[in-house]
Curated annotation (Swiss-Prot):
This is Large ribosomal subunit protein bL35. The keyword Kinase does not apply. Gene3D superfamilies: 4.10.410.60. NCBIfam families: rpmI_bact. It holds the Pfam family Ribosomal_L35p. The lineage of its organism: Bacteria, Bacillati, Actinomycetota, Actinomycetes, Bifidobacteriales.
Length: 64
């Protein structure tokens, strides 16, 4: 039986933690940062945990 391919688009967008949770980078940090406060930029820098309903589908794409 051949190896299952992971979806490369999905693997670039999330990372799996040691406990199996999926982390994703936040949006709104690419440009126009001069209009955001330092506090807002700090908050947006942190990675978010993917919702369980989405992580179920994402794990299928990652082959887990």
């Amino acid at each position: 039986m051949p190896k299952m391919k992971t979806n490369s688009a999905a693997s670039k967008r999330v990372r799996v933690t040691g406990s199996g949770k999926l982390m994703h980078a936040g949006s709104a940090m690419r440009h126009n940062l001069e209009h955001k406060s330092a506090r807002k930029r700090r908050e947006l820098k942190a990675d978010g945990v993917l919702a369980t309903s989405q992580s179920k589908n994402m794990k299928k794409l990652l082959g887990r």
